[in-house]
Design a protein with these regions (language model features):
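Conserved alpha-helix/loop element of class I SAM-dependent methyltransferases that forms part
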Residues: 48-68, 84
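Conserved class I S-adenosyl-L-methionine
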Residues: 69-77
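Conserved SAM-binding loop of SAM-dependent methyltransferases across substrates and taxa
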Residues: 78-90
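Conserved SAM-binding motif I beta-strand of class I
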Residues: 93-98
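S-adenosyl-L-methionine
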Residues: 109-139
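A conserved beta-strand element that flanks and buttresses the S-adenosyl-L-methionine
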Residues: 149
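A short glycine-rich, Lys/Arg-flanked "PGG" loop and its adjoining helix->strand segment in the class I
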Residues: 167-179
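Conserved beta-strand signature within the Rossmann-like core of class I S-adenosyl-L-methionine
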Residues: 179-187
Length: 253
């Protein structure tokens, strides 16, 4: 190698690799992503948002409606309330349904733990499917029910679908609730819809098309339901009402 070659070898500039760094997401951006991932209300920490009173305070006023009755819990989340319907209020059979596989897995685990502790939950089962867009209902959720519950889920059903889907769901539930049975709703104020859309912008287009407004009284009355009870709940962060609708027994007006 010549002296010139040697000098060139020594003085040749080294290649410098610059690592490209992805800018860190802001807390606001992270929150947006989180809410988009849970646009159906399927928050994995949902029950940690509520007080940890056992049983769920909603159930204390529902005991007379569910005791000894076959009860279907639609939008059951991780199954906490579903299991309490059996353990604390002696529903004869309870089925929880949710579209989120992770939440249903958590519900199965909660049942396993409850059984290991000797709790009476053998009459509780869980199913994973989108009940708003699946008919007839599947698995152990099929058949006729004495009580159907839609707690903390009506807003999400409405926002993710349409007025027509919600009306059709109320109609279908009327068909599967036994005469004299009950539909338990926990509607949320329109202001809660607006907050949900602010947190989850992908719901905005559906939101702008909605014309029905909670608590859907006229829609339910027109569908044959009779309102028989209701109360306001004032738990921090979850101020809303619970309404009990009845499918009139045969011969009732």
């Amino acid at each position: 190698m010549s002296g010139t070659d040697q000098n060139e070898a020594v003085t040749a500039p080294a290649t410098v690799e610059v690592e490209a760094k992805t800018p860190a997401l802001t807390s606001n951006q992270l929150n947006k992503l989180r809410h988009e991932a849970h646009r159906h209300g399927n928050y994995t920490s949902y029950y940690t948002f509520r007080s940890q009173i056992v049983p769920d305070p909603r159930l204390t006023q529902l005991q007379s409606f569910v005791q000894g009755r076959r009860t279907l819990d639609l939008g059951c989340n991780s199954g906490k309330l579903t299991l309490e319907l059996a353990t604390h209020f002696a529903a004869s059979q309870v089925v929880g349904v949710d579209l989120d596989a992770g939440l249903i897995a958590a519900a199965h685990e909660a049942k396993r733990v409850a059984l290991s502790e000797g709790q009476k939950v053998k009459n509780v089962t869980f199913e994973e499917f989108d009940f708003a867009n699946t008919w007839p209902l599947q698995g152990t959720a099929a058949g006729r029910w004495d009580v159907v519950m839609l707690l903390s889920v009506v807003k999400w059903l409405h926002l993710n679908n349409s007025d027509a889907v919600l009306v059709e769901l109320f109609k279908r539930l009327f068909e599967i609730v036994a005469p004299g049975g009950y539909l338990v709703l926990e509607p949320q104020d329109w202001s809660n819809y607006k907050r949900a859309v602010t947190k989850c912008p992908s719901l905005k287009e559906n939101f702008k098309k909605l014309e029905l407004r909670p608590p859907f009284t006229e829609t339910l009355l027109n569908g044959g339901w009779e309102e028989v009870d209701g109360w306001e709940r004032d738990e921090f962060g979850f101020e809303r009402s619970v309404r009990i609708w009845k499918r009139p027994a045969n011969g009732e007006q």
